[in-house]
């Protein structure tokens, strides 16, 4: 009986050692798995921090771009308003010059019919500066004096400059 009890005890001891070894291997495997998962977790957390930093930098860069584009848009609007104002000024000058040209054309036609002599061909001349001054005569309020200053140019060069006084031009 004693041998049988010793055999049973040895068998139980062997089974307990085997079970202990199995548990130790399971603990080691689970410890390795936990360590691997911790490494994966740390790697993922590091990637997440890097992505958050990249996102913050991209967000800041995008905000800077938005601010720059808004400034560029405002500058373009200001420049367009300036150009529009300059264009309007040029249109006003053009209208004034058109009126002045029409006035001089009428004056020349009236002078031409009054003198009844043909005028030289002015088609190749440019009138650069003209000035019309109406001066009331002190002696009579019904007579007018007209001063016509004409500068004839060709290709930007002054060819002739003249001033004419006319009394009672109507």
UniProtKB/Swiss-Prot annotation:
UniProt keyword annotation of Coiled coil present: yes
Tissue: Expressed in low amounts in retina, optic nerve, and brain and in higher amounts in spinal cord.
Molecular function as annotated in GO: structural constituent of cytoskeleton
All residue ranges annotated as the IF rod domain in the record: 1-115
Alphabetical UniProt keywords: Coiled coil, Intermediate filament
UniProt feature, compositional bias: Polar residues: 1-10
Residue segments, region Coil 2: 1-111
GO CC entries: axon; cytoplasm; intermediate filament; plasma membrane
Sequence segments annotated as region (Disordered): 1-20
InterPro entries according to UniProt: IF_conserved (IPR018039), IF_rod_dom (IPR039008), Intermediate_filament (IPR050405)
Keyword Coiled coil: yes
PANTHER family membership: GLIAL FIBRILLARY ACIDIC PROTEIN, VIMENTIN
Function as written in the Swiss-Prot or TrEMBL entry: Vimentins are class-III intermediate filaments found in various non-epithelial cells, especially mesenchymal cells. Vimentin is attached to the nucleus, endoplasmic reticulum, and mitochondria, either laterally or terminally.
UniProt record similarity statement: Belongs to the intermediate filament family.
Stated name of the protein: Vimentin A1
Organism: Carassius auratus (Goldfish)
């Amino acid at each position: 009986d004693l041998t049988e009890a010793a055999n049973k005890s040895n068998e139980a001891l062997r089974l307990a050692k085997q079970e202990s070894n199995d548990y130790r291997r399971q603990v080691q495997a689970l410890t390795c798995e936990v360590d691997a998962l911790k490494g994966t977790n740390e790697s993922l957390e590091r990637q997440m921090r890097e992505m958050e930093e990249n996102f913050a930098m991209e967000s800041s860069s995008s905000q800077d771009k938005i601010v720059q584009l808004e400034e560029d848009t405002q500058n373009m609007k200001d420049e367009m308003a300036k150009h529009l104002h300059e264009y309007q000024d040029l249109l006003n000058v053009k209208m004034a010059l058109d009126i002045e040209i029409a006035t001089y054309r009428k004056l020349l036609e009236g002078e031409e019919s009054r003198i009844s002599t043909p005028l030289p061909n002015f088609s190749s001349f440019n009138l650069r500066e003209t000035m019309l001054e109406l001066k009331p005569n002190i002696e009579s309020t019904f007579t007018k004096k007209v001063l016509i200053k004409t500068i004839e140019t060709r290709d930007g060069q002054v060819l002739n400059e003249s001033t004419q006084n006319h009394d009672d031009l109507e």
